[in-house]
Structure formats: C-alpha cells, structure tokens
C-alpha cells in the first residue's frame, strides 16, 4: 500500500504543460476528467477539433422535419475507442445522463441527445467528442509528479468557448502562467 495521499480529480481540467509534452495528441491538450479513482482515470480532451459532422446523417436520424444538415464540430477525446461518442454538455439537459457533475456539466452518450440537439431541444452548450483518454492505476499520479499536467478547476464557459485553438493558451493565462517562462527541463523543487 502506498503512503501517498490520493486526490480525486473528477470534474477538474488537466492542462498539458508546454515543452514537456511536445508532440502527439496530448501536446497542448486540455482534458476534462470524467472519473478519477484509485483504480485509474478517464477523461475527454476538449480542444482537439478534427472535423464537422451532420448529426442527422451521422446518427441516422429518420425524421422529415429536419430538412437541412445539422452541422456540429467533432472533437477527438483521446486515443481509446474512437468508435464511442460522447456529448460533454451543460447540465440544463438531463435526459438519460451517463455522468452528472456538480459543476453545471454532464455527459451523455445516447441517440436521444443527438436527436434533441438536431431538433433544437438539446442542451444550451455541448461538444461532441469521439474517443477518450484513460490511465491505469497510479499512472496519472506519476504523470502529475513529473509535471506533465497542471490541474485547474473546471469552468463551463471555458469548455464551451468558440475557439478551440486558443483554449490551451487561455488555460495558462487563467492559471497565471506565461508559456515563455516554462523550462524544457522538468523537476520538483
């Protein structure tokens, strides 16, 4: 058994540190933590825009009332199970939730929410995310100890901001950090 104290990061946002994670899917990523227990962790990257999709055709919504495409951005949530889709959304929508957080956010993963969004009856804010990020027991804690991630409180307005490319820089500003002051060397004082 470990002497270390476990800090649950569910509902928090991980901010990739600059110059440490220098390439790949996690470079300048922001991850909303869905679950963090001693058995591991799961999160969704919410600033990796990959394309736009038509909800009606993607989910094969059969309804003649929707005559025009309902285009929504699609984000890459992580390297695990790209065939799984999730809606990270505001908690004003509460039908068949997969997860409900106490910070005005929820997660759904069903056809009903896509139909409701297509009909304009869905949540006020939402992101459609495919795939997710997962850590084995102790793996995220090791990454935090080696300064791969910074942790910040979640902010609904921040997650649903319009420009995904600027979210990471805005997260650093929110934390009071200037990217140019980061060293490419890692360590703890």
Curated annotation (Swiss-Prot):
Transmembrane segments: none annotated. It comes from the Bacteria. Pfam families: DUF179. SUPFAM superfamilies: VC0467-like. GO terms for cellular component: cytosol. Coiled coil: none annotated. Belongs to the UPF0301 (AlgH) family. This is UPF0301 protein RPR_01165. It comes from Rickettsia peacockii (strain Rustic). The lineage of its organism: Bacteria, Pseudomonadati, Pseudomonadota, Alphaproteobacteria, Rickettsiales.
């Amino acid at each position: 058994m470990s002497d270390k104290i476990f800090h649950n990061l569910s509902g928090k946002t991980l901010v990739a540190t600059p110059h440490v994670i220098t390439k790949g899917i996690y470079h300048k990523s922001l991850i909303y933590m869905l679950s963090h227990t001693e058995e591991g962790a799961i999160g969704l990257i919410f600033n990796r825009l990959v394309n736009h999709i038509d909800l009606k055709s993607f989910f094969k919504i059969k309804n003649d009332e929707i005559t025009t495409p309902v285009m929504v951005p699609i984000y890459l949530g992580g390297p695990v199970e790209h065939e799984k889709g999730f809606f990270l959304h505001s908690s004003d929508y509460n039908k068949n939730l997969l997860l409900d957080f106490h910070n005005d956010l929820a997660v759904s993963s069903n056809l009903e929410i896509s139909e409701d969004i297509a009909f304009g009856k869905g949540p006020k804010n939402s992101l459609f995310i495919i795939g997710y990020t997962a850590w084995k027991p102790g793996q995220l804690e090791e990454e935090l100890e080696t300064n791969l991630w910074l942790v910040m409180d979640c902010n609904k307005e921040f997650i649903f901001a319009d420009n995904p490319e600027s979210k990471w820089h805005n997260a650093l500003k929110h934390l009071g950090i200037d990217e140019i002051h980061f060293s490419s060397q890692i360590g703890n004082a």
